[in-house]
Each structure stands twice: as structure tokens, then as C-alpha cells.
Amino acid sequence: MQLLKIYYAYFSPGNTTEKVVSHITSSFQNYPVESINLTDYATRQEDYYFKENELLIIGVPAYGGRVPAPVVDALRHFTGSNTPVVLVATYGNRDIDDTLIELKKNVIDKGFIPVGAASFVCQHTFLKECAEGRPDEEDLKMAGEFGDKLKERLRLLVTYDAGDLEVPGTFPYTKPPMGEFPFKVETNEYCIYCMLCADVCPVKAISESNPKEI
């Protein structure tokens, strides 16, 4: 198929998912490329429309074995037109459970055709001793190699012949969506009220006037 543009979207509060997806996308450096940072609250409120001759690569972390709720909400603003999509899940060295199958179901419902999928180990967002330092150099090399294989597959592919891409997971889903985390992040005596945390919080959970209010 003849691609005209590549989009890569990611939800990456710890920046690790972004690293993986950007390395996959680097295989398509000869194409126009645009990133969509779904970690940003305002970006998730925008509408996006994709054509049949464009490719979307979307990466999300597994939250309790499911797609993060903010991403599910954001995908309601995505509309494809038989647009090929690549699904990427990252996880903190435990399991992705139903993350990929949930992501697949959400994008199919919005007019996308899954043509590839992968999962990568990344450092756990809250327990950094789990897969600390991942993705490492070898992980990112594998991400680039995955991108190279995708590029070759898409060169030979016609989307209506793509078939039903099999991904791990079960439906109905094994676990309910993750609700509130069982802990809260709190400031300490070193807080200087710079408000950076409130500015970058993906779900606007921190007061914009007082960071101690969460």
C-alpha cells in the first residue's frame, strides 16, 4: 500500500511508552510524521481524522491489565477511514493481560484496521525497581526492528486483505478498568509551589492553585 503520512500517538506519563513508539516510528523517517501526545489533557479533547492511506501507531501502558481510562476517552475523538493501525502496549514486567485486545476493539469500532501489534517491557511507573531502566538499548533496538518489519509488511499489504489480527487477551475482559489508585502522591517540605506537577498531570487531579490539594 502507498502511505502518505505516519501518525504516532502515545499515553506516556513516565515517558517510557513514548520512547518505544518513537523508535518504532523511526523506521518511517522518509514519510511525513506527526506525533499526538495523549498524555496532555487538552490534546485528548481534540478530534482527529485519519485517511485510508495514512498509518496510525498508538502506544499505551497497561494499567491493571487494561487500557488507561483517559486513552479510552480520547479514542472517542479518533475517526479512521479503513486506516491501518499498529497497536503497542507497554507494561512493568508483569503482564499486559487484556490491554491489546481492548485497544484493538476500541480502534476497530472507530474505523481502523489493525495490521500489527507488539508489547514491550518498560520501567514500572510507581515501583521503579520493577524493570528499572527499561526500555534499555536492546529494547529500543527491538522496537526499531519491529518498525522495519512493519514497513515491509505495509509495502506489500492491501488493507482490505489484512484479515483479523490476533492479539493476546480475552473478551469479556478479565479485570475491571482500574479506578482510583490505592494511594495518593503528596508534596513534602521541599515543595516550592512551582506548580509544574499541576501543569503536567495527565488527568488534572492536582489543584492549579495549591499542589497539596489532590
Residue ranges of predicted features:
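Cysteine-centered iron-sulfur cluster-binding motifs in ferredoxin-type domains/subunits
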Residues: T16, K184-K204, E213-I214
